[in-house]
UniProtKB/Swiss-Prot annotation:
It comes from the Archaea. InterPro entries: PAB1135-like (IPR002739), Ribosomal_uL5_dom_sf (IPR022803). Gene3D superfamilies: 3.30.1440.10. This is UPF0201 protein PF1297. Disulfide bonds: none annotated. It comes from Pyrococcus furiosus (strain ATCC 43587 / DSM 3638 / JCM 8422 / Vc1). Belongs to the UPF0201 family. Pfam families: RNA_binding (PF01877).
Length: 140
């Protein structure tokens, strides 16, 4: 289990287009990060749905998915690529998230789900969430 001080907040964002059901987009976001509190911003052509949480268990689902889907190496690479100062930003496929899985292919006609992890300890968080592996086995 992750300690409370490993991150300050997790924010999850997605565009919601008129052809989409906002409740399904919320479900996709909650499948990755449970406990989100939502706000929606109407931009005319689309809405921006933003969910935020400070719950210490917020990243547990991603932790489990990265291991269950055996994608620790890819997850680690994406976390490192998205690491900027005190934020780690990853983008995942919205429709894949709806069925409860993670796919880092953000190329989707409906746009990705963006996960922003705000942390003062990014290295420690990345090591916990997606440790380096050798032959698929965590080594750190």
């Amino acid at each position: 289990m992750v300690s409370m001080n490993m991150f300050e907040e997790v924010e999850v964002e997605a565009y919601v287009y008129p052809t989409e059901d906002i409740e399904k987009v919320k479900k996709a976001m909650l499948n990755l990060v449970p406990g989100l509190k939502f706000e929606a911003f109407d931009k005319g052509e689309y809405m921006i749905l933003v969910g935020r949480t400070r719950d210490k268990r917020a990243l547990q689902r991603l932790y489990e998915l990265f291991r269950g889907q055996q994608i620790l190496d890819t997850a680690r690479m994406m976390l490192e690529e998205g690491y900027f100062g005190e934020e780690i930003i990853i983008k995942v496929h919205k429709q894949v998230a709806y069925v409860g899985k993670v796919n880092f292919n953000e190329e989707s006609p409906l746009g990705p789900i963006t996960i922003i992890i705000r942390t003062k300890e990014p290295q420690k968080l990345m090591k916990w969430l997606a440790p380096r592996t050798k032959d698929g086995v965590p080594i750190e």
